[in-house]
Amino acid sequence: MQAACGLAQLERAQEFIDTRKRNFKLLKDRLASLSEFLEIAEATPNSDPSWFGFPVTVKESSGVKRVDLLKFLDQNRIGTRLLFAGNLIRQPYFQDVEYRVVGELTNTDRTMNQTFWLGVYPGLGQDHFDFVGDKLEEFFGLNF
């Protein structure tokens, strides 16, 4: 039964991929006004991702704590997720494990502490992304 459902979904795979790409672009365009406060992910050169989520990093210069922003979004019924694990060597599992580190891991720590993602699944559309944009502008004092 699960295999049959999976095969049926495969027939719609390209539709899902195209919709995720469209949704990523819609949300990216809608959040352009917040570039002073937020860093938005970009596809790397020569890539064509099917975005599972919309990564957002709160800039240190914004003066905002990610937790405060996430609480605000949650209070406004906007779902978010943290990225898996962040800096793995800061996880309890690594407390008694020998490992070596090359460099400072500043990007990894920044991702762990300041990044979250919003959904871009195919069931969302322009109205949803406008709502998210309006609420983020409100949070950062841009929505007058």
Outline where the language-model segments fall:
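PLP-dependent aminotransferase class I/II
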Residues: 1-144
